[in-house]
Regions:
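N-terminal [4Fe-4S]-dependent radical SAM core
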Residues: 1-38, 51-57, 177, 184-193
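Cysteine-centered iron-sulfur cluster-binding motifs in ferredoxin-type domains/subunits
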Residues: 34-49, 89
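Flexible, glycine-rich phosphate/dinucleotide-binding loops
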Residues: 28, 122, 150, 174
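P-loop/Walker A phosphate-binding loop and immediately adjacent motor/lid segment at beta-alpha junctions
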Residues: 93-108, 151-196
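Receiver (REC) domain switch/active-site residues of two-component response regulators
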Residues: 139
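Short secondary-structure boundary segments
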Residues: 117-118, 144-146
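Conserved Radical SAM active-site core
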Residues: 14-20, 33, 51-115, 119-134
Length: 196
């Protein structure tokens, strides 16, 4: 597993503007019916990562205007709650995601946006302006690297108990991490997170 220094990894130097996959209308990548965009490229290389195929920034296909139109059309369905970004590392693909999130906020402001990241919230607060801008425009962040030694299959939307589901807007307003108020881990899982 790699641990970056603040502002060491820059999207403009790493991202190739590519994605691994786009999956519309799923129920596993966050709350409600969601569309999921898997971006290419990750520098964290977590041991036991279930998505090793996304590590290369050259993997997959180019992100295109046509794909963006499809994402917007799929997101416009009234039963779709929002869009989820996974990878790969979304925050190393700000060149793709910043224009997309700004368009969503303008055209479909009622939709929510979830993102997974290997960065912790505390690391993100020390990151580059593009990453902080992207963070400021999303609703939910699942933070932290996957840690195989803390694996827990009972966790909601996470693989290891060091990862948190963070309400981004409440956290930014309060200046401290605010956990998503719909967190529904089992009692045993909660006690494990609390101990750490």
């Amino acid at each position: 597993m790699n641990n970056p220094k603040p502002q060491e990894w820059k999207s403009e130097e790493l991202s190739q503007g590519r994605i691994i996959d786009y999956k519309a209308f799923n129920f596993v990548d966050g709350e409600g019916v969601r569309n999921s965009l898997y971006v290419s490229g990750c520098m964290f290389h977590c041991e036991g990562c279930y998505n090793v195929a996304t590590w290369s920034f050259n993997a997959g296909i180019p992100y295109t205007a046509e794909l963006e139109e499809q994402i917007m059309a799929d997101l416009a369905h009234p039963y779709v709650q929002g869009l989820t970004w996974l990878g790969g590392e979304p925050f190393l693909n700000t060149g793709i995601l910043l224009p997309l999130v700004k368009r969503i906020r303008k055209e479909l402001p009622e939709k929510d946006i979830w993102s997974w990241t290997g960065y912790t919230w505390e690391e993100m607060m020390l990151e580059t302006p593009d990453k902080l801008e992207l963070l400021s425009l999303i609703d939910i962040l699942v933070d932290g690297r996957y840690d195989r030694t803390k694996r827990n299959l009972m966790l909601q939307f996470r693989g290891s108990c060091n990862q948190r589901i963070i309400d981004v807007q409440k956290s930014l307003q309060s200046g401290q991490v605010v956990i998503w108020d719909k967190l529904n881990d089992g009692k045993e899982s909660y006690e494990q997170v609390k101990r750490e």
